[in-house]
Regions:
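Juxtamembrane intracellular "pre-TM" segments in multi-pass secondary transporters
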Residues: 1-2, 185-217
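Cytoplasmic helix-loop-helix junction between adjacent transmembrane helices
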Residues: 101-140
């Protein structure tokens, strides 16, 4: 196996894990946070979409900062923002203060992929690109798994506030670890780069005009990521509604972990396959159609269903809606080229996060309008199928 930049790869992966765990704690702990703050479970869970909305904006504005200060320095800033969110959330006395915590994380949440891609792309051989970026993206489901496994016991031990406070240790350790190697990887910085120019976001949008082949991928990134959060952020609330409060521990510690763990294993396997046998584009098409199947099944969840069937479908949702991102980012890196890695992955991140920010609140609204999850999931199925079809047509051309 050709050399893989393991040190920056693992550090950037764990940075993503720390930020994701903090964000997903909002949904995992929502059944306990909501009564304390006098709101509905879904009102807390949808704050994850607030993180992603602000993250989308940060993804579009961060590339100049990456070029000037370096990807590892930005990774430190991400961990600082994560620590700020955890501190604010742990002392929240209202949904407004909790929202402020979500905003403090979101302001740099979208910087994870562009900053790490800027560091990893020049250090990674082309034949290992899909594998490296798939491993890097493991940080997302890893953070979700840590949240699913650790948050419920922490809540039982000391309440939901402890669940946020305990994560501060992880964030602070990451700040120190990245600082130790920052100078080794933050080389070639453009110290004269104007970081406040408005042309940065314009350049990102301009890639859609300059690179026609990126457009179907852009649409798929938007829809697939929206579907990912519709599955991931609402697994706990949906299963609590189906099985009652007694189903909380199954939902958070089994179903949600199955979703995230499947995303981890799939990313690694598909990264190897894409580097050796089947192109990343066709794998992304297949994932879209399987995502559609999983959404249709999720629409029919009922209290008469055995737990094992729910777990299987959660694993399928994780393998597709969560497992696709490594391949997608590798494709954005390939299309952007070495000089526009931060910009191309910034565009990809922004589209993914805008998809989350748009689809998750609409999904939440659909739950209220249709008094359940069935029709919202059927709509998700229609969108993922259409996106996969467009990507397939674009790939054939």
């Amino acid at each position: 196996m050709q050399k893989i930049p393991w040190t920056p790869l693992l550090l950037t992966m764990l940075t993503q894990a720390a930020a994701t765990m903090a964000a997903y704690t909002l949904s995992t702990a929502s059944p306990y946070i909501a009564p304390d703050l006098g709101v509905e479970n879904e009102d807390v869970a949808q704050l994850v979409a607030v993180v992603y909305l602000l993250g989308a904006m940060s993804a579009m504005t961060v590339p100049p900062f990456i070029h000037r200060f370096g990807g590892m320095t930005i990774s430190i800033a991400i961990c600082v923002a994560t620590a700020a969110m955890l501190s604010i959330a742990s002392f929240a006395s209202s949904i407004g203060i909790l929202t402020l915590g979500a905003l403090s994380l979101g302001v740099l949440y979208g910087s994870t992929a562009p900053s790490s891609s800027h560091v990893l792309a020049p250090l990674t051989a082309e034949k290992r690109r899909n594998f490296v970026f798939s491993v890097r993206q493991i940080g997302v489901p890893l953070g979700g798994i840590l949240g699913g496994l650790l948050v419920p016991p922490l809540i039982l031990i000391g309440g939901w506030r402890i669940a946020f406070q305990a994560q501060l240790i992880f964030a602070l350790v990451m700040i120190f670890a990245i600082f130790l190697v920052r100078s080794r990887y933050d080389h070639g910085r453009d110290r004269n780069r104007n970081v406040w120019s408005l042309t940065g976001p314009i350049r990102l949008v301009g890639l859609l005009r300059e690179l026609p082949e990126i457009r179907p991928l852009a649409i798929a990134a938007f829809v697939y990521s929206g579907a990912q959060l519709c599955f991931g952020a609402f697994i706990v609330t949906q299963l609590v509604r189906v099985y009652g409060q007694d189903g909380y521990h199954f939902a958070s510690a089994v179903a949600l972990v199955a979703f995230q763990l499947s995303g981890i294993t799939t990313r690694i396997v598909l990264g190897v396959i894409a580097d050796s046998w089947i192109s990343a584009r066709w794998l992304l098409v297949a994932q879209g159609f399987l995502m559609t199947l999983s959404a249709i099944v999720a629409a029919g969840y009922d209290s008469s269903w055995p737990y094992w069937l729910i777990v299987i479908n959660c694993a399928l949702a994780g393998a597709t809606a969560s497992g696709y991102t490594g391949l997608a980012f590798a494709e954005f890196v390939r299309m952007g080229g070495p000089k526009r890695t931060a910009e191309a992955t910034g565009l990809g991140t922004a589209l993914m996060f805008f998809g989350v920010a748009a689809m998750a609140p609409l999904f939440r609204l659909g739950i209220d309008i249709f008094n359940g999850y069935a029709i919202p999931y059927f709509l998700v199925a229609a969108l993922t199928a259409a996106s996969a079809l467009l990507l397939a047509i674009g790939t054939r051309r």
